[in-house]
């Protein structure tokens, strides 16, 4: 069967949930026995989000091949249970970079390079490069209809319908239908104007997905269908839900997957959603609960820790407990108030990050967790801070620090990696202080050897694993490993050549583990990551002791 394309646009305002809608539709199609792939087109000019402020963009999601991508790719991977790559996220910056590179190379034979056809052709090439024999390709266009940056992308997908045939392309438009509590009614005018804007570009949506606080009644759906020139049965409610994992079931109950199958002439198959029903039953009927303190500096924007948040929820599902998340600003933690700040936390997690702001608060929180036998999980910078804390307070190296925060220090147990072996390219990578910031870290999936008899081994159940990385600083193994091991630190995960330390533990602690990689990027609701599963288990045991 020829690949069918579903393009998902958004109107009225941003952050409506296009990514979750696309992921949920993909999950429904897979539940019907289809194969599916998915892509995010981002109109911003950045080549990728790797150097963007988390407060502006949210989390940077890393794929196996080392691509720094939009956080929506995390939703895609979790819902579709697939591994994506660089080709699944394309930005305006990358599009223009590719076109300019071709122009400099002479590929356009001296022609005038223009938005149409050169930019739009590059976008179309990116879209057509996504499917690899899958039945369906879902393409989400970031931003909002009407944004000037998004116009080339909308023009490109308009052209694709003519080129691929209307029977192979479906347009879904997600829009807002606000509910006015004071009047007790919903308003359709924003949706009408959004569709009008989209149609003025030449795109006539086939399905309208209406985000709303309340279920839309038949009269409202009929009105939207009339004014937006779509079939009545092509208007669906995307009602707010308590858990994002209810969305596939909500869309199924609306009949969205059935309508898509009819419009694209997909094979009629039953939709097996048993795993999603079981997941939601566990979320709604926990046997207990636990509270995790997340100590970071981006706590005012939860999107900065999106995959982390979800991975902790997955760990709760695996243990059939509700996970309450308490975000604690590391800049506000001091030795005097740390007990108060972390009171009631059954486990403490310090996530990744960059820069020295709030680092001492993280180290203080780690010391509290270690000394009071509170389960601790450190990720990336969190592991580095754990090593610094252990070196200072157990090994007695009071000046222990990171080269990132104290470049001239003599006791930097964490240092800038200037050389490492890339197992994918079979080449040695080299970096220095003057290297560009963008795309120069140790990125993507790397192998790791897990040491037997450790908590890491108990979690994974195997000695060889692959995990995703995003860092440029590393444990200074050559200079400090022997001293730290003698002081009781366990190096429980190493790179295959044993040059890099990937996991550390404290042996005389119920559960104290730090990892240099980002395990949250390989967790999904049906299969919690082993480390998150065991961290939540240890936190529950701490609560119940």
Swiss-Prot record:
Q: Pathway, per Swiss-Prot/TrEMBL?
A: Pyrimidine metabolism; CTP biosynthesis via de novo pathway; CTP from UDP: step 2/2
Coiled coil region boundaries: none
Q: Where is this region: Amidoligase domain?
A: 1-266
Q: So where does Mg(2+) get bound?
A: 72, 140
- Which keywords does this Swiss-Prot/TrEMBL entry list? ATP-binding, Glutamine amidotransferase, Ligase, Magnesium, Metal-binding, Nucleotide-binding, Pyrimidine biosynthesis
Q: Name one GO cellular component term.
A: cytosol
Q: How is its activity regulated?
A: Allosterically activated by GTP, when glutamine is the substrate; GTP has no effect on the reaction when ammonia is the substrate. The allosteric effector GTP functions by stabilizing the protein conformation that binds the tetrahedral intermediate(s) formed during glutamine hydrolysis. Inhibited by the product CTP, via allosteric rather than competitive inhibition.
What is the E.C. number? 6.3.4.2
This enzyme catalyses: UTP + L-glutamine + ATP + H2O = CTP + L-glutamate + ADP + phosphate + 2 H(+); L-glutamine + H2O = L-glutamate + NH4(+); UTP + NH4(+) + ATP = CTP + ADP + phosphate + 2 H(+)
Which InterPro entries does its entry note?
Class_I_gatase-like, CTP_synthase, CTP_synthase_N, GATASE, GATase1_CTP_Synthase, P-loop_NTPase
- Which BP terms in the Gene Ontology apply to this protein? 'de novo' CTP biosynthetic process; pyrimidine nucleobase biosynthetic process
The top EC class is ligase
Spell out the molecular function terms from Gene Ontology.
ATP binding; CTP synthase activity; glutaminase activity; identical protein binding; metal ion binding
All copies of domain Glutamine amidotransferase type-1, residue ranges:
291-545
Binding locations of UTP: 14, 187-192, 223
Where on this chain does L-glutamine bind?
353, 381-384, 404, 472
Binding of CTP, residues: 14, 147-149, 187-192, 223
- Give the annotated active site: 380 (nucleophile), 518, 520
Q: Name one Pfam family in it.
A: CTP_synth_N
The residues that hold ATP are 15-20, 72
What protein family is recorded? Belongs to the CTP synthase family.
How is the subunit organization of this protein annotated in UniProt? Homotetramer.
> Which HAMAP family does the record cross-reference, listed alphabetically?
PyrG (MF_01227)
Name listed for the protein in its UniProt record? CTP synthase
Q: What is the source species? A: Maridesulfovibrio salexigens (strain ATCC 14822 / DSM 2638 / NCIMB 8403 / VKM B-1763)
